């Protein structure tokens, strides 16, 4: 039996990110919080330079990190610095917080595929950084759109969106 693995992704308001990611095959659990910044014990009211992020626990026998990243790049715009939809500021930046060298390699390779694909109109600005502390958000932010299905989101699945791999990928 393979142990569950973890991913930490930031792509704008964590409500919409969590709601879509939690439904993906192989995802065991998600929680929203703050990561990639400078404040200990971050909260919604005081999270300094942290991004709103989603911690994902997944079964590597049912999905893989690359598949999660491809979905991540489908549901948010990785070309807008510090912005998703109407949300602006460093809290809403696009970021991948990797937990090991293999996650870093896969993240950089996936970004290169996104760049080469032309699926997004600009240059990818997604930050790729080592994972630091993940500060879990307050209970009212956890699974927000499950409790309030008509609540705010700027994330959506783009029908027909498929990320091709570059011919040189993995070489």
From Swiss-Prot:
<dbReference type="InterPro" id="IPR036509">
    <property type="entry name" value="Met_Sox_Rdtase_MsrA_sf"/>
</dbReference>
<feature type="active site">
    <location>
        <position position="13"/>
    </location>
</feature>
<dbReference type="InterPro" id="IPR002569">
    <property type="entry name" value="Met_Sox_Rdtase_MsrA_dom"/>
</dbReference>
<dbReference type="GO" id="GO:0036211">
    <property type="term" value="P:protein modification process"/>
</dbReference>
<comment type="similarity">
    <text>Belongs to the MsrA Met sulfoxide reductase family.</text>
</comment>
<dbReference type="GO" id="GO:0033744">
    <property type="term" value="F:L-methionine:thioredoxin-disulfide S-oxidoreductase activity"/>
</dbReference>
<comment type="function">
    <text>Has an important function as a repair enzyme for proteins that have been inactivated by oxidation. Catalyzes the reversible oxidation-reduction of methionine sulfoxide in proteins to methionine.</text>
</comment>
<keyword id="KW-0560">Oxidoreductase</keyword>
<dbReference type="GO" id="GO:0008113">
    <property type="term" value="F:peptide-methionine (S)-S-oxide reductase activity"/>
</dbReference>
<dbReference type="Pfam" id="PF01625">
    <property type="entry name" value="PMSR"/>
</dbReference>
<protein>
    <recommendedName>
        <fullName>Peptide methionine sulfoxide reductase MsrA</fullName>
        <ecNumber>1.8.4.11</ecNumber>
    </recommendedName>
</protein>
